[in-house]
């Protein structure tokens, strides 16, 4: 079986222009039927990869979030090798004294001046195609100034569920996709 795959790969490279080698007697046995099979397998591979990529990008978009009585909008986008979620709008951006709300509980003092409508909530999540979830990242809770592990998944087409957890303790919330 392995020899067949090696020969097939070699022949694909030669016929696709990968190598400019003279045809040998064994390669002349490659028939149109064999080429159709090879092309069909390549087409299936391309479709499978593109389908998986489309599924991983399903998380990208804008979401409405209601948490602790505060409504906000969050944008999820590709960032590096994973995805990031950042606040883009908060319904109560100004405090009662007229000053802007900031990330004042952030343990990193250099980030305490970040406006509430610019806080990065989720970072470095990646798609796990086997389990149809986004994991391996962190979620930040600006109300507590704490960061947790995170797992995200869809419940239907428009509801993104996320679970922030530390060991066996977790909290699950929902974001509603608005575009």
Name every feature range the model reports, one short phrase each.
Residues 32-41:
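Bacterial N-terminal signal peptides that target proteins for export
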Residues 160-167, 171:
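Short, exposed beta-strand-loop hairpins at the edges of beta-sheets
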Residues 60, 65-66, 71-140, 147-148:
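Central antiparallel beta-sheet cores of small beta-barrel/beta-sandwich binding domains
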Residues 137-162:
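Acidic, glycine-rich flexible loop segments
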């Amino acid at each position: 079986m392995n020899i067949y795959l090696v020969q097939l790969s070699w022949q694909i490279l030669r016929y696709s222009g990968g190598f400019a080698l003279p045809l040998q007697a064994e390669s002349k046995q490659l028939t149109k039927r064999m080429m159709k099979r090879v092309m069909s397998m390549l087409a299936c591979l391309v479709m499978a990869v593109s389908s998986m990529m489309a599924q991983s990008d399903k998380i990208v978009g804008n979401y409405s979030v209601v948490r602790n009585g505060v409504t906000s909008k969050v944008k999820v986008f590709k960032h590096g090798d994973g995805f990031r979620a950042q606040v883009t709008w908060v319904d109560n951006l100004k405090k009662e004294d007229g000053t802007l709300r900031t990330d004042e509980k952030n343990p990193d003092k250099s980030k305490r001046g970040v406006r509430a409508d610019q806080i990065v909530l989720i970072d470095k999540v990646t798609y796990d195609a086997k389990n149809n979830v986004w994991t391996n990242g962190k979620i930040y809770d600006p109300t507590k100034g704490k960061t947790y592990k995170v797992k995200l998944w869809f419940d239907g087409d428009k509801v993104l569920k996320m679970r922030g957890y530390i060991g066996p303790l977790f909290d699950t919330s929902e974001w509603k996709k608005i575009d």
